[in-house]
Swiss-Prot record:
Keywords: Chaperone, Cytoplasm, Nickel insertion
Cited InterPro entries: UreD (IPR002669)
Entry protein name: Urease accessory protein UreD
GO molecular function: nickel cation binding
Keyword Zinc carried by entry: no
Signal peptide, first to last residue: none
Family: Belongs to the UreD family.
Broad class of the protein's primary localization: cytoplasm
Oligomer status and interactors: UreD, UreF and UreG form a complex that acts as a GTP-hydrolysis-dependent molecular chaperone, activating the urease apoprotein by helping to assemble the nickel containing metallocenter of UreC. The UreE protein probably delivers the nickel.
Domain of life: Bacteria
Cellular component, GO annotation: cytoplasm
Location of this chain's protein in the cell: Cytoplasm
Amino acid sequence: MPKINTSSSGWLADISLFYERRGTNTKLVHREQVGPLMVQRPFYPETGVAHTYLLHPPGGVVGGDQLNINIHVSPQAHSLLTTPGATKFYRSSGAISSQTQNLTVESDGFLEWLPQENIFFPDSQAQLKTQVELHKDAHFIGWEMNCFGRPVLNEIFENGFVTGRTNIKVDDQLLLSESMYIDSIDEIKHAAGMRHYPMLGNLYIYPASEALEEKLRTLIDENFHEQPELFGSSNPICGITEIDGLLVIRYLGHQTEPMMACFSTLWQHTRQHWLGKLPEVPRIWAT
């Protein structure tokens, strides 16, 4: 493990968003922000759901930057958050950048956490932390997509360092605690979890049910076995696991678009399973 300079001379960005149910809609009732993280005003392409775009104006994260994101969804509120593009972690001369996400959903609240991918440039130094706190009667679907290097440009993650920690709790009971440790291309080649793939995605869904799990397994089989043309020659791997009422879908691949297509399909059908209709896909994903 290389020596990391944890001193910070970069941006400190902190944002907290609080959503509440007001009548038939969900409202962003309170926000607190420091630094360049901000959101556009929520909009409502579908009744009752507050769609929100999370913006980081400088366009990327450099060594020493610290991003803290806090989302709180109150009872019966329903919010969907995404980003207008990839979050890019640029090369660092030694200072570590960090992104911490705290997501809280109360009873009968509904949070869809759907950011676009993280891209870690060679020589980037980054630390990711995600803490999800759910009430047992909450609904949550969230993903993270991480790209190490820029495979589309044949630029590999030869040097650099990325750590990650994700904890998911339901009623203060820890359901999932997992870590990620990537230290240069050797980790990608030899780590049991990466299998030479430069992209790793995780999709988390709560609550699980046998019917939903079977539906998503069928979708994965159909996408990977019956529509191989969608994935070209990238030969991705995707699997699903149920852990104490939480569904975890893992994806390994070489390209962003197939991973996004897979996760988006699973998200849409999960929403349909829960609410009886397909969601409105964020328009920003098509730009």
